[in-house]
């Protein structure tokens, strides 16, 4: 999903240097540690050694969007899927993605973390 989001940002949002901070420095991190972008939408960069407590691991709830393909498939409003990663989609770009055709069809219960996308 993260690579699809990076490619979408490059080709549909025209963010040519869209990347993940997981790949190193430089570019525009569309994907990153939550601690890098969660302060009022502004980029905050900690050190690479400052990773304690940043991994989401195990089953996580995802609220499914009404009339989405994933909701039709699962036939449920909420599902649980296994998750093991510390890098997340920067939700500050959500509106731009949606205006260009991406559907965030599964979000964390607090609506801050995309779990499922549809193109």
Regions found by a protein language model. Name each.
Residues 1-9:
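Catalytic nucleophile loop
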Residues 11-119:
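Amide-donor transfer/coupling interface in amidating biosynthetic enzymes
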């Amino acid at each position: 999903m993260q690579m699809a989001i990076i490619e979408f940002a490059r080709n549909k949002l025209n963010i040519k240097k869209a990347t993940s901070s997981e790949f190193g420095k430089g570019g525009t991190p569309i994907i990153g540690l939550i601690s890098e972008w969660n302060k009022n939408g502004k980029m905050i960069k900690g050190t690479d050694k400052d990773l304690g407590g940043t991994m989401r691991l195990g089953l996580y709830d995802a609220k499914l969007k009404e009339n989405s393909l994933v909701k039709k498939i699962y036939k449920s409003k909420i599902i649980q899927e296994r998750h093991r990663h510390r890098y997340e989609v920067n939700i500050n770009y959500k509106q731009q993605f949606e205006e260009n055709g991406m559907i965030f069809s599964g979000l964390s219960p607090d609506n801050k973390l995309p779990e499922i996308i549809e193109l």
